[in-house]
């Protein structure tokens, strides 16, 4: 699906942290119904890119623009961007001691409901909603009573991130190395959740080092990032080429 305007358009974006310029004239267009993979060596700017999209306050925009559904989001804080439909799955999900997963997820869900001028849901109604979503990431309802990410395995933390994405029904999801540290079984579960969630009204950005995630989640485009900009774009075959050749041949 290719709508008249991109769901996300990044124009000549320059961004820095502590006066260190990391993103350098970055350009990218993503339409609804598309999955884009972003690959690149360590230090290429991939994680900075994801945090800048989500509105992380540590990063400063030097020039350029980020348009989401045709409107600039540079002046919006992370919560506003989230309510508009942007979701970031962290590479290293944080633990929140003393807060149950169910309470955390219900708070996030009701916060978005309020933003959309929809009725908030009570705990009983929410349990019915979340129970259906749990099945998509192969998790037991027992998981809801545990504190957020506390004592979770790496795979459980990543599944929890995908669960949040599904629950919030985000239009643009940025998955920052969601596949890192996963065994093959966990990778398959995560991929199933992503593929079930994806449709023609959504777009996903996969940030990854490895081809293996792309064996299960088929991207429409693969971009290579180096030194803060996209230096090459191709199909899923580009990821396979990178797997066999590395990044040196692109220099």
From Swiss-Prot:
Keywords, A to Z, come to: ATP-binding, Chloroplast, Nucleotide-binding, Plastid, Transport
Which positions bind ATP?
40-47
Domain ABC transporter: residue ranges: 8-250
GO terms for molecular function, please?
A: ATP binding; ATP hydrolysis activity
Is the Plastid keyword given for this protein? Answer: yes
Q: Kindly list the places in or outside the cell where this protein is found, as annotated in its UniProt entry.
A: Plastid, Chloroplast
Q: Which Gene3D superfamilies match?
A: P-loop containing nucleotide triphosphate hydrolases (3.40.50.300)
List the GO cellular component terms. chloroplast
Q: Can you tell me which residues the record assigns to a coiled coil? A: none
**Stored Pfam families:** ABC_tran
Q: Does the keyword Transport apply?
A: yes
Q: Which family would the database say this protein is a member of?
A: Belongs to the ABC transporter superfamily. Ycf16 family.
Question: What name is this protein filed under?
Answer: Probable ATP-dependent transporter ycf16
């Amino acid at each position: 699906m290719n709508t008249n305007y991109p769901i996300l358009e990044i124009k000549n974006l320059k961004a820095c942290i502590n006066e260190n310029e990391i993103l350098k004239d970055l350009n990218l267009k993503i339409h609804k119904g598309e999955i884009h993979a972003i690959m690149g060596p360590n230090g290429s700017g991939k994680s900075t890119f994801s945090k800048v999209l989500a509105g992380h306050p540590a990063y400063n925009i030097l020039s350029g623009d980020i348009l989401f559904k045709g409107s600039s989001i540079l002046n919006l804080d992370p919560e506003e961007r989230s309510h508009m439909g942007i979701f970031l799955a962290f590479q290293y999900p944080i633990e929140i001691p003393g807060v149950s997963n169910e309470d955390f997820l219900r708070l996030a869900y009701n916060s978005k409901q309020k933003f959309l001028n929809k009725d908030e849901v009570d705990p009983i109604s929410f349990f019915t909603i979340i129970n259906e979503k749990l099945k998509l990431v192969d998790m037991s309802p027992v998981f809801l009573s545990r504190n957020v990410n506390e004592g979770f395995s790496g795979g459980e933390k990543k599944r929890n991130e995908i669960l949040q994405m599904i629950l919030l029904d985000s239009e643009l999801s940025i998955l920052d190395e969601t596949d890192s540290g996963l065994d093959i079984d966990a990778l398959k579960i995560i991929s199933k959740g992503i593929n079930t969630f994806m449709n023609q009204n959504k777009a996903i950005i996969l940030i990854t080092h490895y081809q293996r995630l792309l064996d299960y989640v088929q991207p429409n485009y693969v971009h290579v990032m180096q030194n803060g900009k996209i230096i090459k774009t191709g199909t899923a075959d580009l990821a396979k080429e990178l797997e066999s050749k590395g990044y040196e041949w692109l220099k």
